[in-house]
Amino acid sequence: MQDQYSRTQLLLGAEAMEKLHHARVAVFGIGGVGGYTVEALARSGMGALDLIDDDKVCLTNLNRQIIATRSTVGQYKVDVAEQRIHDIDPNIKVTTHRCFFGPETQDDFDFTQYDYVVDAIDTVTGKLALVMKCKEAGTPIICSMGAGNKMDPTRFEVTDIYKTSVCPLAKVMRTECRKRKIKHLKVVYSKEPAMTPIEDDSISCKNHCICPPGTQRKCTVRRAVPGSNAFVPSVAGLIIGGEVIKDLVGFVPLKG
């Protein structure tokens, strides 16, 4: 009997779909990258999703974030994502966490309960804390490197952190992972050199912040706000979603 996952089952098979229906994945960061990862996971039949983010949808998110529309501005991202997931499949178990993940909140999570973890957060401190907790728990993790200030979505690659190049964030992560004796870390990164954002005082976040009331991390306190678009972070997020799904079901690609 056909259902909403029939077309996916034609590629993966019934046994793989059953694995996905019983899997629980945590996505840390529901923004330009993480939002599309959540979309891919929900549309692929994931049984349970944990969404972690403390931010609210801002008008400036509409250029790239799948959860951002005029009607969702000012709402918590995890709440909007939960509603969207349940519009796709009401049977998916969704757990939302309105928190900023970092060393201060890392012990609030039991990483042994997750079958896979996605890092789509934008601070090195948070990324490293997340990686360390996953390594301690033996939980698979995939990390997103820099997706801002880029224009070519075809330059993304999936590889180990120690095989990355070009990306400044990946360089920092390589150094910090070595210090922590992390032997392997699966990442999605771009070989495209980052552009320098055009300076334009009329749209400066520091001078014209429009973050919704109650936003915990306003753009006025950020060191730099990267330029972004609809077609680069989204691709990174979908690549990550695909990697999670393939890893969970043990997908073996055809040779040739």
Please provide the spans of the model-predicted regions.
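Hydrophobic/small residue at the entry helix of a nucleotide-binding pocket
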Residues: 33-34
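Glycine-rich phosphate/adenylate-binding loop
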Residues: 2, 109-113, 126, 136, ...
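N-terminal charged helix/coil linker that caps or initiates catalytic domains
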Residues: 1-26
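Conserved N-terminal Rossmann-fold NAD(P)-binding element of oxidoreductases
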Residues: 27-29, 52
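Conserved S-adenosyl-L-methionine
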Residues: 42-48, 136
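Conserved SAM/SAH-binding loop
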Residues: 98-106
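Glycine-rich phosphate-binding loop and adjoining beta1-alpha1-beta2 segment
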Residues: 46, 51-89
